[in-house]
Amino acid sequence: MRNSFPPSDGGRSTTDRRQQSFPSSSTNRYNSRSAQSSPPLNHCTTWNQQHSQYHNTNFPPNYRRDRAPSSGFSPPVTRARPNFIVQLLHPAAANSDTKLSKKQEIESIALLCEIPEESVHVPQFGCIAASFSFRQWVDARSAVVALWDYRLQGRHDFVPELIPNVVVPSDMDELKDRLRDLFSSHVLSLMENGQGVKKVRMEIDDKSRQVASFSSKRGLKFEVFEKKKALEAERDLVVNRLDEFNNAMKSILRYLIGQDGYEFDVDDEDDEDVAVFSLEGAYDWRRIHYLILRECRRLEDGLPIYAYRRQILKKIHCEQIMVLIGETGSGKSTQLVQFLADSGVAASESIVCTQPRKIAAMTLTDRVREESSGCYEENTVSCTPTFSSTEEISSKVVYMTDNCLLQHYMKDRSLSGISCVIIDEAHERSLNTDLLLALLRKLLSRRIDLRLVIMSATADANQLSQYLFDCGILHVNGRNFPVEIVYSPSGTEENSVVGRIASYAGDVVKMAVEIHKTEKEGTILAFLTSQAEVEWACERFVAPSAIALPLHGKLSFEEQFMVFQNYPGRRKVIFATNIAETSLTIPGVKYVIDSGMVKESKYEPRTGMSILKVCQVSQSSARQRAGRAGRTEPGRCYRLYSKTDFDSMNLNQEPEIRRVHLGVALLRMLALGIDNIAAFEFVDAPVPEAIAMAIQNLVQLGAVVEKNGVLELTQEGHCLVKLGLEPKLGKLILGCFRHRMGKEGIVLAAVMANASSIFCRVGNFDDKMKADRLKVQFCNDNGDLFTLLSVYKEWASLPRDRRNKWCWENSLNAKSMRRCEDTVKELEICIERELTLVSPSYWVWNPNEGTKHDKYLKMVILASLAENVAMYTGYDQLGYEVALTSQQVQLHPSCSLLAFGQKPSWVVFGELLSIVDQYLVCVTAFDFEALYMLDPPPPFDASQMDERRLRVKKVVGCSSTVLKRFCGKSNRSLLSIVSRARSLCSDERIGIQVDVDQNEIRLYASPLDMEKVSALVNDALECEKKWMRNECLEKYLFHGRGQIPIALFGSGAQIKHLEVDQRFLTVDVHYYGDDVVDDRELLTFLEKKIDGCICSIYKFAANKQDCDEKEKWGRITFLTPESAMKATEIQKFDFKGSVLKVFPSLSTGGGIFKMPYFSSVTAKIRWPRKESSGRGCLKCPSGDIHSILGDITSLEIGTNYVHIQRDQLSNDSILISGLGDLSEAEVLDVLEFRTQRRDLNFFIFRKKYSVQCPSPTACEEELHKRIFARMSAKNPEPNCVQVQVFEPKEDNYFMRALIKFDGRLHLEAAKALQELNGEVLPGCLPWQKIKCEQLFQSSIICSASIYNTVKRQLNVLLARFERQKGGECCLEPTHNGAYRVKITAYATRPVAEMRRELEELLRGKPINHPGFTPRVVQHLMSRDGINLMRKIQQETETYILLDRHNLTVRICGTSEKIAKAEQELVQSLMDYHESKQLEIHLRGPEIRPDLMKEVVKRFGPELQGIKEKVHGVDLKLNTRYHVIQVHGSKEMRQEVQKMVNELAREKSALGEKPDEIELECPICLSEVDDGYSLEGCSHLFCKACLLEQFEASMRNFDAFPILCSHIDCGAPIVVADMRALLSQEKLDELISASLSAFVTSSDGKLRFCSTPDCPSIYRVAGPQESGEPFICGACHSETCTRCHLEYHPLITCERYKKFKENPDLSLKDWAKGKDVKECPICKSTIEKTDGCNHLQCRCGKHICWTCLDVFTQAEPCYAHLRTIHGGIGLVELGVPEHPVAQPVHRL
């Protein structure tokens, strides 16, 4: 560092010390002058000698330099005139004449230079900061040199200037030499010891050490090698920077030393052809110093392009054209123009640098002016933002837009006065850029002195080089660090959508969360496509210690600046659009997430439409995004797509000339005389269709006409060329001028160009809703352009100091409004200069009044956009049909027309926006008649379009149940009938809408097709009405097992059928086909085929969890068992090319008696085909062979003693011999028992050749025969068993077979397989025993959402299953992203248990809250309900399942989280339901369309006017649904409703609201209270009256059937009504009453069980039938079905009745022919069958059977027999001697 202190009094000056190294000639020059005076820089000595000669002087402002200044503070005195005056000028003297002088700073400088105080004058104002007066030259010279010395040291920034009143040429030469030496010494010191040079050298040393550390390592990995290469490149870049700095300093030294023959050796290392500075003429010390300062800044800033300066200049000097490729941030845009201006290369005239945007040109101009301040003359750098034919290019460096340069070219086709053109940002390949390149390409051959430089960050350099005559390419390497690329493609489908946000946005948020959790610190930059996605991502990203920031073009400067700020302790996560690709460089970015998508405006030549759509980025853009991560340190880029996707991307962004309308370009080319557009040499030629469509558009606009095959500009076309706007905007302006609405036309063009950014809709959900409310006040019913016009008109009427605040208050973008104002001013100037028209300053259009000007404006807009016409289709779901393409598109949600709730028949739009759907934006309504006033006429047939418009027809009189069934589950039936209608009429526009709330169907079809569609819908409705009338409930009469009668309870509360004979009524329908089946067609087909009546339908879930049974369509119940039997007797039905099969259903009864469903019972069986060798091998687990050997020594298997020995050839095998004909299973059972292990593997060595076996076909038949015979089920179907025997290969040891059973027969299957195990088939040898391996399988599928919610619980459950014996579970993903759990077991019980637990987990817990009525649950199907569920799911980490058909809700998750979610859902939904009851609707068929706007105008966007009048009420306006949400009491709502109704009646054409018709209940004949409409006939009743009718019917059996009481109706009340009106308890009572009535009216054919209160019913046997017993399943009593008494086998009913009447008669009848007598004592009847004549009665008496004598003991009786009767009556029979009499029981 140079010493910053002044030299001491007696020492040599700094300058003198430096002179020692200079040539002697210089020293002699100084010495000759020094002989007369002191050393020049010895300030102290000089002033000590000379100060006495001066008086105390003070210089006032505007003093005369030719005389001594007079003091304004002392009396005028005569002073000596100073010979020399040294002035200090402010650094920005030319720019400031009012800057306050820094008096203290001046005094300190004077003191530092030892200038006497009396010589100092400090003016208060002006460009002169101070002046010093001197009498002696030596003092003046020393002061000037000292002041420059201190300025070079950085002690002050004033510019010293000498004003000599006495001019001596030698004095000036001496001062020049002194300053030259001073500056030269300063330059040398900077080169040797400058602070910046030291830092750079340290940086070089540090990089070299890092490179050396890699060089010492061997075998570098690829990543490390790449890092080494990056460090070497960075080191070389720094070295080149230092070389450039030294070269620049040497250039300055050469200039300083080379003047006047003064020579100095600067040790040039090489002889450069091109000098970096073109310095000539007299020394400008101020400029030289600024050049030095700028070089020092360049060295410290380290812009990459600085290291390539000489290389660039040499290339431009030698070559006419150059392509310069440098990454964003390399300094191309600011430095190259300065390099050229400094060096003089290609700078003989002006240097023009073009930018694609005006703001960029202005910003760069300011930046270059700031950097080069003092280096050039004033106005060297300028900006020409707009073209003017009267202005010339005069500045040395000019920044302008490419559009502006094109205009200059059209004025001067030689570009006179321009020596170099720089096309910047060429990678954007804008339309103007490509046109400029094409025109300059031709110009270069005419002007060989013109230089062209193409600058770009990512452009295809080779393509540009080839186009521009194979010019040279120079790559400027940036300061990037290596970036690791990670390809992480998403698992979601490419086009899937969540809400209105595409799936890739969710993937970006997930990746950001993952990176934040797992990676080290560093900013995350994520690329999305739009403002909506960016804000959505910021809301969804929730992570600790992180802050989510948005970055998109609509943010204010302050909001954008937030991404550059630091947030201590928090990681920045920036979600940005492609604005962050090249426009901005954000420091600290280490991780980049590339979604791979970008939103681009594309012009489709086929349709002539400009569409803004989301598409894939190019490879160059992907690399540019990845490069964001390597600016300050090595980074990582996560690409959410695969490497294959990257390779398939376009190499570069498609040029704008292929993406936009070519109207502007063609106009300019025609103006230039280029008539053969197709042959013009573009860089990338547009497709011929685009050129043709552009010409057609220009013809339509009246700008071009075709004469003799040649295109010519019309007068209007020439005007459009001069305006330089898009033709449609120019046409808009010219059309308005014709109607004397010039102001409106100019403003319309300005706001239309900025339409997307004027309304500011940013922030969270509430902020956006507020912005929507604020917008309503500006909405105009004529469309968006009128709305924007009214906004600008009101904004322009405000004082300038109020405009920003007004924009903030109304959610408007103040920046966009100012941009519109600038555009308006530019257009006004352009119109006045180029078209010589006077732009009016007044408005003639009034947004608050409908006048003829509205019509004029709409006509002008239509003429300007005649090709962008759309017609309302008549169907909201289709929206509008674009006239030229027949596309169906919707109005954008931000469209002003939606604020009025109307869809105009005809609209004209600005462009098509393609996001998730396609939308019309910038829409204006017009009348149909205006199309006939267009000249030329529109390019489509408007009349034909109007004829094709869809008409609407309403179908009323249908109940809500019929409508719901008409729609089907998930609207499947409705979609099917729509599809049939479209196919029938060959019109894809046909639509059918069902409004259940209004009980109506709306049909949308053309007039020709309406009859067909109406007939189709009516047929379907009649089917549904018929099935609703026939609908029955299956009711089991009691709970239990055995024979349970089933009642079919149907309409009219009647029993339609009572099944007591155990015949089946319900069947399962299986559909085997790939196509989606129409349920209604299928049911109608079955009814016709079977000629039966269907009374109940149950459709299995479309995504049911038993995926193995996906062929099961559903279950239907027939009204008679004969129909059901007939359906099952047919093996299969041919239904539209697919197969239908019908099986009896075993799971009926409304859910209580359902048997569990299993997938097919699969058994694998095998039997050996090769005989055993008697030896086998036991494979042991590793390390356990010794313990196993110990367990199985002395082993006996069956009757065989086996020999055990260890296998010498294997460490884990044991050989077992002596097995005989034992099978593997028999041996393994014994081994497992002895070792108590289940991990053994045993196999038998079998002989080489197989024995003769029956054929596989014979085996199949035999197996089927045996298994089917063992099925114990009643009447099993023959196809319930399938057997497949596989053909064996030569080396197979076993025959194998697969057996599948019907899943409903799992118990029978298990029994049959158990009996089959161990059997031998005919034709097989005894050792060929069958081994059965039963495999019971089932599977459950859950969606990815449920799986992600219960993943941890599911894994725990599966792990527990793994530890259990008897079953296995495995989890696997399916092709559609769901997950399947497969259950496999060897018995049904483990399957059932596992499945039950899995179902409980995956199906979730149902919400059984009393407040969860169907009306409340229906809210979950709305958008608000869906958002509520998503919010709760996210907060509680649960998943909510909504059954839309049954209106039930289940929640999946842990028990604690389910409880929390249930509480929040119930509370939130109940609150929402309550709020819905307090809503005021602002649109409807009888409401004025502008009511919402009137409400906002009258009461304010926040409805403050209503709140002030209704105290305590909380209101919120929902502009999308036109609803005021009232939070308060019902009385408050009524007050608000009253105020709104009063406003609605004002100016309303509808007048007063008609009186409502009071409806009368047909039962009570009073006004309906709490009404209910019957489903069958839609008649309205009081609900209480209907309930009373049901109660009366239960008490009176004659009241059945229950019918509608409306006059002339008499329709039976259907089951759906009874379900809706009655509780389950009351419904059971009604069914019981109906059963009683049914039995009573059966004419004795049916009877209740004789047991009191027993609900069972049996059929009475006919006269010719025998009395079969009825065994009651409820009370287990046995009843004769003929006589209804106790069951009496072997006795006729008539005789049994007689026995019942006279029991003795039955005894006598029984005793006939039998040895029967009575006990003399107890009179019991005794029958003797065998034994002796001694009997003992139950009363204890011993009786002689011969004479009936009675004894008290046995011995006397025996004695009596022997004595009286000659023996006991037995001959040695070996029977007991004392038989006991068995009394006969009377019946």
Swiss-Prot record:
Residues 507-673 form the Helicase C-terminal domain. Zn(2+) 3 binds at C1649, C1654, C1672, C1675. Its main location: plastid. SUPFAM superfamilies: P-loop containing nucleoside triphosphate hydrolases, RING/U-box. Zn(2+) 5 binds at C1719, C1722, C1737, C1739. A zinc finger (RING-type) spans 1561-1609, 1719-1747. A motif (DEAH box) lies at residues 424-427. Zn(2+) 2 binds at C1577, H1579, C1604, C1609. It is an enzyme of class 3 (hydrolase). Residues 313-477 form the Helicase ATP-binding domain. One of its GO terms (cellular component) is chloroplast. This is ATP-dependent RNA helicase DEAH11, chloroplastic.
